[in-house]
Amino acid sequence: EERVQALTGAMRSAWMQGDKTETVAEATALLAESKLVPELAAEAHYYRAKTLMAEGKPGVAAKDLVVLAKDTRTAYGAEAKYLLAQWYFDAGETEKAEKEVLDYIEVSTPHAYWLARSFVLLSDIYVKMGRELDARQYLLSLQQNYQADDDIAGMIKSRLAKLNKEE
């Protein structure tokens, strides 16, 4: 238990200092512990995934994202589900990205921001598939139903403007 506490502290410290190598090393060591509570395992997967993505290794990070995305009730899982779909989209796997987002919509999450980001991503997916009408409908619905004061409104506005310009 003391070892787990020490590894957790080292991982968090490395993360906060932006030490990518150490964050990955400590998270990996923590995940190797046999008596790790699920919350700490999720935190370790999250920090490792985010660090690997920042290092330009999204394919390696995807393994952690898949684990986290199984539980969208947590903040880590909610973000991971979105990031996984975004990674598929960026990798040119449009159908896989669409499937991931549609699955996210079905299982839902209490973390509205990540679900809203997923709807924006779905509109990008549909534009890429040539389904501009579907993309517009999702954006308009999101614009009407999502009221938080964050960057989502700007994303919706810019995408709708682009769609209107292409008509």
Where are these predicted regions, by residue range?
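Acidic, polar-rich low-complexity tracts and alpha-helical solenoid repeat scaffolds
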Residues: 1-167
